[in-house]
């Protein structure tokens, strides 16, 4: 554990790799993840159908039985695994972040590296093994992704807490997700990249960040965490429980908490409720210094069978357990839902002390030992708290909420139930994906709700009539295509947010995004609203939504440009502004979008890297990425109507000209400013084209060029049109979980 190792193997993918020679090489691997070939199930396996065949109540009973079935190989604290399983579920879901929708519990990624070996996940390998008999019994009817989170819910219920509900619907993945940026640090618990002048981390064995010699050169009260991260250290879920960089400052800890929990979509009230609610149960573990702890699961020897953090202190388990290095039990009844956390937080005054592992923590002053021991019924402890717990009292805003919860236990219980439900379900997507008998009836704003269809849908004849009406408005086809793309391409495969359903492109904040060209967008929407009003006014029962018309406008324009039929399935509805959380949707705004030739790279991230990242959010494969960029360019879908990348003399026609002309060796390219390039005739020097990095990469990058050559060949036109229409239709329907998903490149996660 500690620094990144070097792979010296000369087989099985070992040795010096392309990324070692060219670390800045554009990597397309994230566009090839989670393909059917990686799954042990057949392509026909339907997880939703399997889940629906599950005896859900029997499963919950079996999970409940595990809670108090203490195993000698990993004994339960206080005879109950509830606290451990709450932490397991929390740490599965808690990796979610709002900026890109990645992380979270919806893929069961806690089973894989790096998450399975993060310092913050010490001992969760044991939690998952405790659940194996349950998973083994129910097999493919319950995914690990669902089981990890459901178990946390059942743990709360088994200790007397009434939860808000639960929804399943998370198919498992079968490989580590390589798409998420977890930070640039090379050492566990480091934060010198995310904060610039941060802590270098633990350079050897250890799970505690306790090097005081490194902590005098940065201002923990003003530092800014880099985006899209939502954790203060490499390998932590949120913040350092000892305080920022191990400094026991509750006020500064409050600042870190607000940043990290906010980036996980939680407001102050939800944050206080989650911390206090979670810390009502169980304990932390720091029986001895971290030097006693051995390798994490990914570095552990084979005979440990995927278990890590072998502990040579005492028995290495039970009272000798080491996880965070902190040794805190928060309440007098750590296996019951009580109000002790807030009662003790404000009742006692606290003084700084050290855990047996040497970590900073706090102990109550002038009181008697009242806290039970996890294994010795004759032993009592003084009340203790973490620095991050005290932040709920000493941060001014958190204190107001904490005191209100102290005085109103019912408010606290309701707030925790709702925040916990949000934590577990934030990345599950729309309700059309939710499964099971415990789905709450109350619809919550963070679900991005859309109205149900309450009218007959348009039929094929109506669609034909509507397409004619749209084209008759006089709006340029390129604008219709651009608007449809802008609406649908907000989708994010991580948290399943965005997409065309809801027509939120007409609402704040999307209607004002620069990338959506607001004047052009307003023109298109006005025309489509006219078509909608005319059709709905003339129909006695059938209605068409603006969400459907936006997509249909793109379909009509595309059919005109390509001379082929483009699939369209009605059924979208229009969300209201009241159903749209503006601050939350602001995170979906692209600052660089190579599909629409918008924005520029930064000193750290190139335009083409932003393009691949957006392609991943759209769940695209490399060929889909290439064909969509090439098609959108010749169709004139650049956000501002610019000619960058429009490598054709017949714009508005769906041709393979983009690839033909990009690959033409009669053109010599030169950089204008490192972002924009000119293509000139090699013989005459005459300027022929302009393009951006998001265009030239399709000729410069070996793998993308190989794909471009297929579409740019003399036989490539028909394939290009066919593949563009398929990829276009895929994007238009990414959020249509009410539909089957033909042609998907992988599981509909």
UniProtKB/Swiss-Prot annotation:
**The UniProt record lists the keyword Oxidoreductase:** yes
* Compartments, as annotated in UniProt: Cytoplasm
- Give GO MF terms, alphabetically: catalase activity; heme binding; metal ion binding
For activity, the cofactor(s) needed are: heme b
Question: Which cellular components does GO assign to this protein?
Answer: cytosol
Xref: CDD domains: catalase_peroxidase_1, catalase_peroxidase_2
Q: Which residues form the active site?
A: 91
EC number(s): the record gives 1.11.1.21
Cofactor binding note of this UniProt entry: Binds 1 heme b (iron(II)-protoporphyrin IX) group per monomer.
User: In chain numbering, where does the site feature Transition state stabilizer fall?
Assistant: 87
Q: How does it assemble?
A: Homodimer or homotetramer.
The record's section on PANTHER family has: CATALASE-PEROXIDASE (PTHR30555:SF0), HYDROPEROXIDASE I, BIFUNCTIONAL CATALASE-PEROXIDASE (PTHR30555)
Sum up the protein's function in the record's words. Answer: Bifunctional enzyme with both catalase and broad-spectrum peroxidase activity.
What's this protein's family per the entry? Belongs to the peroxidase family. Peroxidase/catalase subfamily.
Name listed for the protein in its UniProt record: Catalase-peroxidase
Q: Tell me what gene encodes this.
A: katG
């Amino acid at each position: 554990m500690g620094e990144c190792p070097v792979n010296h193997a000369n087989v099985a993918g070992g040795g010096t790799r392309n990324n070692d020679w060219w670390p800045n090489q554009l990597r397309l691997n994230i566009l090839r993840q989670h393909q059917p070939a990686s799954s042990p199930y057949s392509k026909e396996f339907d997880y939703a159908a399997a889940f629906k065949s599950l005896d859900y109540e029997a499963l919950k009973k079996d999970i409940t039985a595990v809670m108090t079935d203490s195993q000698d190989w990993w004994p339960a604290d206080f005879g109950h695994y509830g606290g451990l399983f709450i932490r397991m579920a929390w740490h599965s879901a808690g990796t979610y972040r709002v900026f890109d929708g990645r992380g979270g519990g919806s893929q069961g990624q806690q089973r894989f590296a790096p998450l399975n070996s993060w310092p913050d996940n010490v001992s969760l390998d044991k939690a998952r093994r405790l659940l194996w008999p349950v998973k083994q019994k129910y097999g493919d009817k319950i995914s690990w992704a669902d089981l990890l989170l459901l178990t946390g819910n059942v743990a709360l219920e088994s200790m007397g807490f009434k939860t808000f509900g639960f929804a399943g619907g998370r198919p498992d993945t079968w490989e580590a997700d390589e798409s998420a940026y977890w930070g640039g640090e090379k050492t566990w618990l480091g934060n010198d990249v995310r904060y610039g002048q941060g802590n270098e981390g633990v350079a050897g064995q250890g799970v505690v960040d306790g090097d005081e010699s490194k902590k005098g050169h940065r201002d923990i009260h003003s530092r800014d965490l880099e985006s899209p991260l939502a954790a203060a250290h490499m390998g932590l879920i949120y913040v350092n429980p000892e305080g920022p960089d191990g400094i026991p400052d509750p006020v500064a800890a409050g600042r870190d908490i607000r940043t990290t929990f906010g980036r996980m979509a939680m407001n102050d009230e939800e944050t206080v409720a989650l911390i206090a609610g979670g810390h009502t149960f169980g304990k932390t573990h720091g029986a001895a210094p971290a030097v006693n702890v051995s390798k994490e699961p990914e570095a552990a020897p084979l005979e440990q069978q995927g278990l890590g953090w072998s502990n040579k202190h005492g028995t290495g388990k039970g009272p000798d357990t080491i996880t965070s290095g902190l040794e805190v039990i928060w309440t007098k009844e750590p296996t019951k839902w009580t109000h002790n956390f807030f009662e003790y937080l404000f009742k006692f005054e606290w003084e700084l002390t050290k855990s047996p592992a040497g970590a900073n923590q706090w102990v109550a002053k002038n009181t008697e030992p009242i806290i039970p021991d996890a294994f010795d019924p004759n032993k009592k402890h003084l009340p203790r708290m973490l620095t991050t717990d005290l932040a709920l009292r000493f941060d001014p805003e958190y204190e107001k909420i904490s005191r209100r919860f102290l005085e109103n236990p019912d408010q606290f219980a309701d707030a925790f139930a709702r925040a916990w439900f949000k934590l577990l379900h934030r990345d599950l997507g729309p309700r059309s994906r939710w499964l099971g008998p415990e789905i709450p009836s109350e619809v919550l704003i963070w679900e991005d709700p859309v109205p149900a269809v309450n009218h007959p849908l348009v039929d094929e004849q109506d669609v034909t009539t509507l397409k004619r009406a749209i084209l008759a408005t006089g709006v340029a086809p390129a604008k219709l295509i651009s608007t449809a793309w802008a609406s649908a391409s907000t989708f994010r495969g991580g948290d399943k947010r965005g997409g065309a359903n809801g027509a939120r492109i007409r609402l704040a904040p999307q209607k004002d995004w620069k990338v959506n060209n607001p004047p052009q967008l307003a023109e298109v929407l006005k025309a489509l609203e006219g078509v909608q009003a005319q059709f709905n006014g003339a129909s006695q029962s059938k209605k068409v939504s603006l969400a459907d018309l936006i997509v249909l406008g793109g379909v009509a324009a595309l059919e005109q440009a390509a001379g082929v039929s483009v699939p369209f399935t009605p059924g979208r509805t229009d969300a209201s502004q009241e159903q749209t959380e503006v601050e939350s949707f602001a995170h979906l705004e692209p600052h660089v979008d190579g599909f629409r030739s918008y924005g520029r790279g930064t000193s750290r991230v190139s335009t083409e890297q932003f393009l691949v990242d957006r392609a991943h959010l759209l769940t695209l494969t490399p060929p889909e990425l290439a064909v969509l960029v090439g098609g959108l360019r010749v169709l004139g879908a650049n956000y501002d109507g610019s000619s960058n990348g429009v490598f054709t003399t017949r714009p508005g026609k769906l041709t393979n000209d983009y690839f033909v002309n990009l690959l033409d060796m009669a053109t010599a390219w030169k950089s204008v400013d490192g972002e924009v390039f000119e293509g000139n005739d090699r013989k005459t020097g005459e300027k022929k084209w302009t393009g951006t990095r998001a265009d030239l990469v399709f000729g410069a990058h070996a793998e993308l060029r190989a794909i471009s050559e297929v579409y740019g060949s003399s036989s490539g036109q028909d394939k290009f049109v066919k593949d563009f229409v398929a990829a276009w239709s895929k994007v238009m329907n990414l959020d249509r979980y009410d539909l089957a998903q033909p042609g998907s490149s992988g599981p509909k996660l």
